[in-house]
Every structure is written in structure tokens, then in C-alpha cells.
Curated annotation (Swiss-Prot):
The keyword Cytoplasm applies. Belongs to the purine/pyrimidine phosphoribosyltransferase family. This is Adenine phosphoribosyltransferase. InterPro entries: Ade_phspho_trans, PRibTrfase_dom, PRTase-like, UPRTase/APRTase. It is found in: Cytoplasm. Its EC number is 2.4.2.7. Transmembrane segments: none annotated. One of its GO terms (biological process) is AMP salvage.
Length: 185
């Protein structure tokens, strides 16, 4: 069987088209007037998941020592990417979910704030990490994740997402970081 190019399936479908074709559109979720893009059908399709992971890590190959996933769907991507690149996986969790010594970072939500945490001993200072998540919206969550690693002395090699909601300008929260998004809406 032929190997596919990064970002394409074996049928040579560009990864953005593949994601768009599998992504489910759910009107009025989580509240009326919102059109939710559900990526779980992409993750449920083995060939699509492989294409997504390959396309996310390809631009950063050899530039990271571990892959971090942001709770919760980022865990799926990070675990697959870490396995594919023979690196470790790091979890960035919501507050109160990690049992050992943590560092915390607050970030703004539409109505309030939230907190992310990271075990301080998971990556030594000087390490390099690739941060993955499913969606880049306002950039609050991914910006907080990047700040956590930087505060631990870990270099953020890049940030990768499956889908970017361009109108929300999330990249502005990631200024100074390389961002890879596979589908921009």
C-alpha cells in the first residue's frame, strides 16, 4: 500500500476537505443560535484520525520532546501524536484534576474565568513541547496552556489544532507561537 503525503489520506483527499466532509454540524448547540461543529466523527474514522495526526505533527517533526493535549479532546490527539512520533504525552487539565504538585494558569471565558493546571515535574526545563487541541476559538485555553509550559521553562515548539474559528481571532492569544490549523472556518 502506498504511503500518503502528510495532510492527505491514501485516497489523496486534502485533510481540510476530509475534516469538513466528516465533521457533523449541530444547530442550536450548546444553546440556541449556535452552530456547533462536532469533530467526533473525524476521530471515529481511523484513516481520518491518522491523516489529522500526521498533518498536525509534520511541520514540527524533530522539534519537540513531548506532545501536550488540552482537556479533553486534545488528549485524543496528543496521545496519537506522541505514539506516532515516539515521544511522551503530557496532559493539561482543568483545576483540581492532577494529584501531584501543579502550576496553575487562569484564563478568561465569555462569562467568567477558568483555570488550567500542569504537573510541574512532567517535563524538565529546556524541553520542547507541541501543544494540540481540537479547536482554536478565542485562544484563551491554548494561550493559558502555552503560558504554563513557558513558566516551567519548557519551550513551546508549536500549537496544532484540527479546526480554527477565524472570526474569533484566537491566533492573537498565541502571538509568538507557530500555529498549525488544518481547517479554518
Amino acid at each position: 500500500m502506498n504511503q500518503s503525503e502528510p495532510g492527505q489520506t491514501r485516497r489523496s483527499v486534502p485533510v481540510d476537505q476530509l475534516i469538513n466532509s466528516l465533521c457533523a454540524t449541530v444547530p442550536d448547540y450548546p444553546k440556541p443560535g449556535i452552530i456547533f461543529k462536532d469533530l467526533t466523527p473525524v476521530f471515529a474514522n481511523g484513516a481520518a484520525l491518522r491523516a489529522v495526526v500526521d498533518a498536525l505533527v509534520e511541520p514540527f517533526k524533530g522539534q519537540f520532546d513531548a506532545v501536550a493535549g488540552v482537556e479533553a479532546r486534545g488528549f485524543l490527539l496528543a496521545a496519537a501524536a506522541a505514539y506516532a512520533t515516539d515521544t511522551g504525552v503530557i496532559t493539561v487539565r482543568k483545576a483540581g484534576k492532577l494529584p501531584r504538585k501543579v502550576i496553575s494558569e487562569d484564563y478568561a471565558l465569555e462569562y467568567g474565568t477558568a483555570t488550567l493546571e500542569l504537573h510541574t515535574a512532567d517535563l524538565p526545563a529546556g524541553s520542547r513541547v507541541l501543544i494540540l487541541d481540537d479547536v482554536l476559538a478565542t485562544g484563551g485555553t491554548l494561550g493559558a496552556a502555552a503560558r504554563l509550559f513557558e513558566r516551567c521553562g519548557v519551550h513551546v515548539a508549536g500549537v496544532g489544532v484540527v479546526m480554527e474559528l477565524g472570526e474569533l481571532r484566537g491566533r492573537s492569544a498565541l502571538t509568538g507561537h507557530r500555529v498549525r490549523s488544518l481547517l479554518r472556518l
